[in-house]
Amino acid sequence: MSKKHPVIAITGSSGAGTSTVKSAFNHIFINVGANPVIIEGDSYHRYNRDEMKRVMEKKERIGNKHFSHFGPEANLFGELEKAFKDYGEKGRCKKRLYLHSDKEARPFGQKAGEFTPWEDVGKDTNLLFYEGLHGGVVDGDIDVAKYVDLLIGVVPVVNLEWIQKIHRDKELRGYSAEATVDTIHRRMWDYINYITPQFSRTHINFQRVPTVDTSNPFIARDIPTLDESFVVVRFRDHKYCDFVYLQDMVHDSFLSRPNTLVVPGGKMGFIMELILREEIEKMLNH
């Protein structure tokens, strides 16, 4: 961990409230004068889009049906750990971008699904901000979580996560529900072993819980809205919260356990800003 060059990581699946999280952190960074290095988790995938497809087909031919972007074989965990460690020690690290679309790729003269070259970043920045699947991952001797000063989990309950995944893949990628269910099956081993353990290492978790029936996520017509949800906020340490203040600020919030605050789903971005702004200010002013 670093007091001079803090590292903040958001860990959670794509679509688990990403737009709300990004909006909240944009507001915080502007308000506290932060100038972050921003690292996206998919830039630390091991393979580009075409390579991943070929490797996955090869793995399936030899009987490995669990190869996925959730696990170590398809990611550069060691390089991610080094980036966090280097930034914490020196305020510098290496970074690249994953180009999701033709629009993103065009300015670089590359194709969608490729990576930009690695570059040295960090000059004139005062924190590193990571958002992706593996901000708190541990795998053997690799311990990414060890170098994170503030680790935040953003994760819906699993049925809601699957509903979001099915709808997102259909709308953005044109995948059938059956194809997405196959992806969920393939990722499950890595999900259990590499994704979920991270949420026990976080300092704060934000978990969205729907108040409508999601018991069969594979036939759900709609994604439950924020207003059809609560957000469960779990704190590992009471130093990150003033429960009396937070309950005064958020109408209809309540404590479900001594370290757990529940707020209406529509207040997810607001509660993030209330809780995290003060912590980030402390880091920058230390």
Enumerate the predicted regions with their spans.
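Glycine-rich phosphate-binding loop used to anchor ATP phosphates in small-molecule kinases
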Residues: P72-V144, R186-F199, V209, D213, ...
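C-terminal accessory "lid"/substrate-recognition subdomains
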Residues: E114-K123, V144-K146, V158-H286
